[in-house]
């Protein structure tokens, strides 16, 4: 029995002080390697995340234009004409005086306007606000919706980009 106890005590002593004696912390080279890996991962993931956020915010423009279309049709039912007046300041003689619709999207990333309206139709536009991050979305800067249901979009170079902007 004495022999077994000596082996057990010897193993515990080795584990306690012998094997782990030199491992007291993290070396500088290990820290540099970890920081380099974190930097590489961040460099790869942040642009993809930013692109995802810009694409997600495009939904705000689409939703605002569809809500504006509903408001225009409601106005037409009451006044027998369409209007380009979104707020009461640009009121017409018909009651309600205007659409009483906000001139900005829900979170304010897009400015809304009815660029043309008459007795037979309208064209609504949502444009990214130049002072906000959504303006850096160069692929889908301006969205348009007409009373006929035509959906168009323009990129920062004013070229058509309908399928990417309206279908995603």
Q: What are the roles of these predicted feature ranges?
A:
Residues 35, 62, 69:
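Conserved catalytic core of two-component sensor histidine kinases
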Residues 22-49:
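N-terminal single-pass transmembrane signal-anchor helix
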Residues 55-59, 67-88:
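Alpha-helix exit/C-cap motif
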